[in-house]
Curated annotation (Swiss-Prot):
Pathway: Amine and polyamine degradation; putrescine degradation; 4-aminobutanal from putrescine (transaminase route): step 1/1. The gene is patA. This is Putrescine aminotransferase. Keywords: Aminotransferase, Pyridoxal phosphate, Transferase. PANTHER family: AMINOTRANSFERASE CLASS III, PUTRESCINE AMINOTRANSFERASE. GO terms for biological process: L-lysine catabolic process; putrescine catabolic process. Its cofactor is pyridoxal 5'-phosphate. Its EC number is 2.6.1.82, 2.6.1.29. Pyridoxal 5'-phosphate binds at G150, T151, Q274, T332.
Amino acid sequence: MNRLPSSASALACSAHALNLIEKRTLNHEEMKALNREVIDYFKEHVNPGFLEYRKSVTAGGDYGAVEWQAGSLNTLVDTQGQEFIDCLGGFGIFNVGHRNPVVVSAVQNQLAKQPLHSQELLDPLRAMLAKTLAALAPGKLKYSFFCNSGTESVEAALKLAKAYQSPRGKFTFIATSGAFHGKSLGALSATAKSTFRRPFMPLLPGFRHVPFGNIDAMSMAFSEGKKTGDEIAAVILEPIQGEGGVILPPQGYLTEVRKLCDEFGALMILDEVQTGMGRTGKMFACEHENVQPDILCLAKALGGGVMPIGATIATEEVFSVLFDNPFLHTTTFGGNPLACAAALATINVLLEQNLPAQAEQKGDTLLDGFRQLAREYPNLVHDARGKGMLMAIEFVDNETGYRFASEMFRQRVLVAGTLNNAKTTRIEPPLTLTIELCEQVLKSARNALAAMQVSVEEV
């Protein structure tokens, strides 16, 4: 039987939620009630699959942990008052920490004036953010399109490349195995994992996937396209594959891809949604090789962990295809004043506090520690790798990776696997993580592996 809509029920539910939003603290009974509600609502109205996922990576009934607030720049607090060191960083959102006061203040000040733009008049913060990114981005990147997520920034990049290259008779994209560019239809066509792709087949035509880091395979794809008349419009890739398991290509790979793009008249699209904004020790990961893309995709940390925002930055030559009709590709909320305020404040914090350099230094400390643990527990850990504060520990199998995440949760450190590689646990903390907390994370990882080793020996 169909359930009849109930405005009274919706009103009561929204009022209850608003009451919770107003509260800074909850008593014990309120916490227990909220946990029960959240679990029930996820099961009945969000997606029960999320609960099953939480059960698979936790133990002892901890799957129902409900986050409540930020504890500090680098920690989260759940409804039970337990504080967790955040080594997941919302998959790369919290580069400047949780509730960074500079970012929060900028958003609050803008909120007091004008939360959203009129859509008709010229909005100043969108102009100022575009100018700031043009000054910050490498090479000739000059014009920015703003959206709300990384997937949207990739969609915009693909459409820009199509609009630029279609008149030139070039329609095919090269992406790479292990790639993750998002899950909307266009971005998913570039993403490489069959689990995400298969239910939505057929995807957009015109995408080839070659092995990541293999410049010979990339060169062959270009040559074959030339021979068959199916010329390459653009290459899209991540400088470091995040969801693929934090996979670093050989040194010089990006440089060689850039050369191929220049040789064959293709555009180079770099997806820095996860690697950008200081994460790898440079503001943008492509700067490690001084490579200049034609189109650059940003999101995640651009909003400072306070507002969602994505950006697609392109050279004037490429972006000019939108000059005659700027309404060819737009979005209602993209570049809104609150999001732009957050992004401007985030860039200011990253530069003022030199957080990219801090990411390099602290990342070296953490990675050295993880590599030492890999040497001590070779039957559990296959590899530890990364750059800056984007790291991964690869385990011998999926189950071991899940067990490590569970043990770290017991140690009150939040980590998780990557979407394209379940054996790999991602370590992606805020760039503001202190040296003391870095040491605590390494201690917790040692304790977790020791507990896992005992379990293995008892079997």
